[in-house]
């Protein structure tokens, strides 16, 4: 009996040090198609596990809606060079993202291009806000030019 207890304790200890990682899928997004949009940032939330941009975007009829744009977390953004002040509320931005399949005003961010005019904060430089390996993207961080929708 004592050998079983020792073996069980060793097995439990070995399993407990394995990295634990859980994540939801991105099946609610249409990752087969890119959409390009422009708007004004309302809020920026750099949270774990996902950061969020809330952006006012006008549709073809001129109606404005607030869109929720899901990005990678702060660590992933930092890893690919996105700085805290690159995008702030009130900034104009252009995004490329994957829309929600249900038609709601939200998308999975791929890229953000700040259009605020401040070169020190990356004006006109497109940055990867998915962290270089998320939903539908190759792990290398190299991306094919998407087709606009």
For each feature predicted by the language model, list its residue ranges:
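N-terminal secretory signal peptides that target proteins for export/translocation
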Residues: 1-2
């Amino acid at each position: 009996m004592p050998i079983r207890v020792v073996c069980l304790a060793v097995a439990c200890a070995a399993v407990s040090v394995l990295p634990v990682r859980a994540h939801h899928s991105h099946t609610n997004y249409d990752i087969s198609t890119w959409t390009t949009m422009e708007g004004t940032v309302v809020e920026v939330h750099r949270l774990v596990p996902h950061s969020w941009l809330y952006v006012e975007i006008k549709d073809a009829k001129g109606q404005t809606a607030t869109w929720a744009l899901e990005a990678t977390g702060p660590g992933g953004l930092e890893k690919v060079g996105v700085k805290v002040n690159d995008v702030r509320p009130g900034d104009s931005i252009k995004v490329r993202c994957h829309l929600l399949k249900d038609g709601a005003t939200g998308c999975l961010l791929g890229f953000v291009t700040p259009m605020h005019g401040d070169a020190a904060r990356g004006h006109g430089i497109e940055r990867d806000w998915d962290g270089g390996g998320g939903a539908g993207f190759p792990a290398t961080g190299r991306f094919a030019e998407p087709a606009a929708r």
